[in-house]
Amino acid sequence: MICPEPVNLDLNRMAKILRIRPEDAHKGTMGHALLVAGSYGMAGCDSVAAEACLRSGAGKLTLHTIQKNRVIMQMSVPEAILLLDSGKEYLLASIQDLSPYQSVGIGPG
């Protein structure tokens, strides 16, 4: 939903937007997100954005980041699936197939 005007988010509005998870829900039924993030020295941005994505309700998260951020990301967000880029300082490769993902975030870090 795209909203051209600012909207105040109160409990009533949020109750209409947010859904209760079914009791039989699991990571495979709650959506797969892709986060394209990270340059050298900016792994904190990746970590915060990845946590926010998972806390917002994504069942699975794939994080496309550079090789140098691998250890930091595996330690700070171990539940994220890492898709490591060949770039040393910043992302070089593009992701050709976005069909596995229900949402894509680009740009933090």
What are these regions (language model features)?
Residues 1-109:
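Small-residue (G/A/S/T)-rich helix-start motifs and N-terminal tracts that mark the onset
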